[in-house]
Each structure stands twice: as C-alpha cells, then as structure tokens.
From Swiss-Prot:
Keyword Protein transport part of the UniProt annotation: no
Keywords per UniProt: Membrane, Transmembrane, Transmembrane helix
Compartments where located: Membrane
Topological category with respect to the lipid bilayer: Multi-pass membrane protein
Source superkingdom: Eukaryota
Principal subcellular localization: membrane
Gene Ontology annotations for the cellular component aspect, listed alphabetically: membrane; mitochondrion
Annotated InterPro entries: TMEM65
Keyword flag Membrane: yes
Listed Pfam families: TMEM65
Ranges annotated as spanning the membrane: 108-128, 136-156, 194-214
The protein's name: Uncharacterized protein C03B8.3
Organism of provenance: Caenorhabditis elegans
Amino acid sequence: MDRSIAKMLSNQQIRNFSRGVGHLRRRAAKNNVIKVRPEELRPFFNQYSVLPNGIQNDADAKLFSKELQPGERKLLFDALRKITADQYNDHKKVVEVTIDHEDLVKVWYINFIPMFVYGCLDEAFLIIGGESINNIFSVYNGMSMLASAAVANIICNLFLQLPADRINDVLGFKKPVLSVDQMNIPEYQYAAFGAKLSGLWMGLTLGMLPLFFIDDNLDNRASDNGDLLVSVANTNGDEYCELFCGD
C-alpha cells in the first residue's frame, strides 16, 4: 500500500507533504481521502532508501556524500555554509558578547610584555650599535652618526622580532581562549592597543639608559684639546722668535 502511494505522488507533492513534523497530512485521490505520514514521504530519506531515518551519525553523512556528484557536493556545501552563516548572524544579533576581567588582564599582559621587551632592546642596541658602527666604519668610509644609527636600526629590527614574540612563552604567559566575537569587541581592541602603546613607550624610555655610559663629547674634547695645543704652540713660537730674533 505504501509503495503504491509513493508512486502516485509527484516530487512536488512529496515536498509539500514533507513540510511539517508530528502530524498527518491528507491527500485527495479521486473520491477517497488517504492519510499519509510526512516521515514516509521524505524525498531522500524513507523506508525504501538506504538511509530510512535520515543522517544520524558520521557514517551516514559519509555515505550520503558519496552518492553525490562533485558539482552536487559543491552546491550542497555552499548552501550549508550560507545557512550556517545566517544562523550565526541571527545568534550574534541576539547574544551580547562580553569578556571577563581576568581575560582582559591576560590580554593586557600578552600584548604589553613583547612590546616592552622589543622597545627596550631595540633602543639599547640602536644606541650601542650606532656608536660601534660609527667608530668602525667612519674611519674607512666616513659614515656619519645618523647613517650608523640607521644601519643599527635595520639590524635590530631584523633580529629582535622573533625573540620579542616568543617572550610570552618563555615567561609562561598563556593567551586566553576567546572567540572571534570576543576579539572583535571594543574592549579587546582598546586593551590590546593600550598595552602595546604603553609597552613600547616604556621600553623605549628604559632603553635609553646606555646614554649615561657613553661619552658623546669625547671626540669634541679631543678636537678642542688639539686646537688648544696648536694655538699654544703657535703663541710660544711667536714669543720665542720675538725674544731671540727681534722684530
């Protein structure tokens, strides 16, 4: 009886009957009214198909996907992805996303520490490296102090990126587990930006400590002393000539 009913119904009628769950629908055939359960009229899942109860586990999903052609799989994947995105957007509109205070503190530290270490080492190596490069290369090619600082800055930026990024793992700081929505809210953005800005500013300020141990006026004093000795020698020479040679 069920097989004859399925043959009598068209695909569109089957789709119409399959809309709705848990109640009986009626189909008029000539003068008789036949009661049909919607579960028995599902186009792809019925008692005559391989999956009579629908897709209930991974094995059923794999079996169903194997029966599809590559083009059909792509169309089905796009449709499922669109439905999932629509459901996600609807859920996003309803649920208010927040971050706990402890997670915000962790976000602050994991952004503050790398920038602080990077700023401190970069500034210190820039000062020390610029001084060393200037002392080495200025003798041979006349490199200026600004050019030496630029070369030192390039070297520091190339070799300090990786250690600064891994400093959190070395110190044992773990990133908080946050969703994409939580990482897109303003609280997360403000905490991360403020931590990076503060860390870089404090690191660069602390990195200027080598300036207290570098004598920048050494060359100027040596030049001034040399000029002083030359002028004294010239003065003494003139007085010696006046004394013994006369006018």
